[in-house]
Amino acid sequence: AETVAFGPMQKIIDAIIQGAPGEELAAIPLPESYKATVVLASEQTMFDGMDSGDKDPRQALHLQEIAMPELAPDEAVIAVMASSINFNTVWSSIFEPVSTFGFLKRLGKESYWGARHDQPFHAVGSDASGVVLRVGSAVRKWKVGDKVVVHCNYVDDQDASSHNDSMLGDNQRIWGFETNYGGLAELS
């Protein structure tokens, strides 16, 4: 099969397409950086004074190389095989109803792991499917090589109020909208 990936991602994509088992995927080094669709904090005011209908998301969305964040114990890294643009991405790109950088700054103040989200860029995207490449030390249900579809709800599994209904969680967020490192990227 022919692929369209280039650089460090090529080996990962080739292995996935060829059906490599998890142990083979785990042996492939992850790149230090990867391509992601981002909005920039420095452009938050670019649409000030404009009507919503006149704001063009294409002006604010950029394909940029970003550094691979450190993997938290309760996270996984996936090679994104498919993603989409939904209303969260459009809102992020026109900075409405508010700029998402406030969400990232607030998350950044919560913990060591949250601090990774407070960046001068926001890698957007609340939808993705892909293949697990790494899992954090506290991940129990998923393993390298699993094919996954990512749900946008970002919930603290240690918050008891979210166990029966994730919408009741005190810190429930939307992944790729209120968190960084979303699905419109090579890795997430």
Residue ranges of predicted features:
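Short structural boundary motif marking the start of a folded domain
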Residues: 30-37
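Charged, glycine/proline-rich intrinsically disordered loops and linkers
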Residues: 40-59, 96-118, 159-169
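Intrinsically disordered, low-structural-confidence terminal and linker regions
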Residues: 1-6
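Cysteine-cluster motifs in flexible loop/terminal segments that predominantly coordinate metals
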Residues: 154-187
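Helix-loop element at the rim of GNAT/NAT acetyltransferase active sites that forms part
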Residues: 87
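A short N-terminal beta-strand-loop micro-motif at the entrance of redox/enzyme domains
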Residues: 12-29, 44-82, 121-123, 138
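Glycine-rich beta-strand-centered segment in the early N-terminal region that forms part
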Residues: 67-84, 97-159
